[in-house]
Amino acid sequence: MENTESVKVDTIDNVQNNTRSEKLAPLKPITMGSFENPSSRKQNQNDDTYEDEPNNKFSRGPEFMYSPEAGADRLSKLSQSMLDEIRKLGYDTIFRKFVDELNSDLQSQNIQKESFEDFESKWHRIVNTICNQFYRKNFGTPYEQRGRSSTRFGQNSSPNMSSELTTFIQETPVLQIIQVFIDMLQQDGNYNGKQNVDEEQIRYSRFMYRSFVTLYHKCNGTWKPQNNSENRGGNSRSNKYQRNSNRYPRNMPNRSSKSYGRTASSGRKYSQVDDETVTDTKNTYRPKPRGSYRFNKSSNFTREPERFQNSRNSSGHGRMN
């Protein structure tokens, strides 16, 4: 716990280097690279940020990630055939392929959980764990696949992908691939210019968009967990109990009674109790004796039936003879 702040500082400084020892092949970079196809990528070794014009308003700031216009601009730099192939195969299939590439990268480097050669290897292990957990949570259960075919990935565990898409997944930085999912889901969750809109698919796209945004922040080290009771407002359990405690004060007798607030025919509320009538609030309920349904209702809670009293055996149990 003492080295938490130092690790956070090293995350920003060291992840952008993306350098490994000369003996091993380099791992997949995590930070954003130039947003274009690997086949048509320009040679620029010092570029580890989003490559665009200097005056492009989408290059920096929050709109760089969340603006629909910025997302459409980034997707326009990718081939339309590859985007159509991603939608055809499904986001779950593409993301599973992406996770498999992360696993193979770590296995090729012989990186173990117990030992790390440098900080970058450790950070790749963390990102790999985060992405695997994300896949199991969002694509591994039928509940998260609502509005989609739940057997799409199960029947096609090794889909046939084009060489262009395979190269893109293998050579593109981690955050850039996640950004592609964010931009495509943002476009899928937009109503503008669409006919015969599938409401369920729209809700699913928006749900997954928010999930991938959280994944993006977790992978680059900027995600901050928040208290659910503060975010959910009235839906949180703590606020629910607080509302009930204000409604039913502690000094009110029988505050858990279902008849609270009801009005009798005489106009008096059941919750209004005089001191003269209150005798013992702790023992107002008496258990119903066994077999008492055979007798008059007036004798159920006032006294035991005479026949029931005479039928007690030596063990003390009230059995009928």
Swiss-Prot record:
Residues 1-63, 223-321 are annotated as: Disordered. It comes from the Viruses. Residues 227-239 have a biased composition (Low complexity). Signal peptide: none annotated. Residues 34-47, 241-269, 310-321 have a biased composition (Polar residues). Residues 1-11 have a biased composition (Basic and acidic residues). This is Uncharacterized protein R562. It comes from Acanthamoeba polyphaga mimivirus (APMV).
